[in-house]
Amino acid sequence: MARGGRGFQGTVLKALRVPEHKLTVTGVREIPPYTELTVQCPSLLGARAAALPPTTWVRMWIPENGREYQRAYTLTRINRAQASAIILFLHHEPAGPASRWSSRVRPGATVAVQVMGGTSYRPPSPGDRMLLVGDPASAPALADAVDAAPAGSPVTVIMLAPETGHLPRAERDHQLIRLDPEVSEDKLLAAVDHALWADTGDLALDWVWIALESGVTKTVRRHLVASGMNRRSTQHQAYWIRGRAMGIASDA
């Protein structure tokens, strides 16, 4: 068990009486560049638990060397009957506490999680023409969003990801456009424009979700709004910040 408090964020969550849940790891699978954990938690994932919208992420308190590090990870493939879900940990260099923990964890291990502000996702309306733009960090959430899309909505996904390595994919039908992660900004925006405009010159999209590195996310969103997309139809969520860890450490 980690020693010490959980810092300011932990104090706020405690003051707001945000419930704490315990996830139990029941399965571990290596699918580079991810580690896939199957977890169970009746209080959060069971049949009587509150509904969780698509792309919901949990605040995980990752233990390491007597401290706890808060990191956010998306719950996917929720199975209410089994009170289970899948969490994918993307490995990168330099490795962080969550990446190291997922590499050494074994079935039977537990980890504390809380849910507060677990998603800003606004679901599309039936028939909306959808575009999602992401990368390996947000791919689990994008797959979850695509699987939850209305049956009559055509879906296009632009993914900045290498051709090699596992990439989480939705089971629902969708068009996937895979771009080199080092692609230039101009080429990324050109791919977005190709999805944005119909042959008639009219907008071909009703709903967009952008989930990339913080700076790139802002660039794509500004481009879409400048091109005529309604701001409320253009959602965005940065899944990482270049050169910075997304999370906090507990008090030592």
Residue map of PLM features:
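Extended, composition-driven regions rather than compact fold-specific motifs
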Residues: 1-252
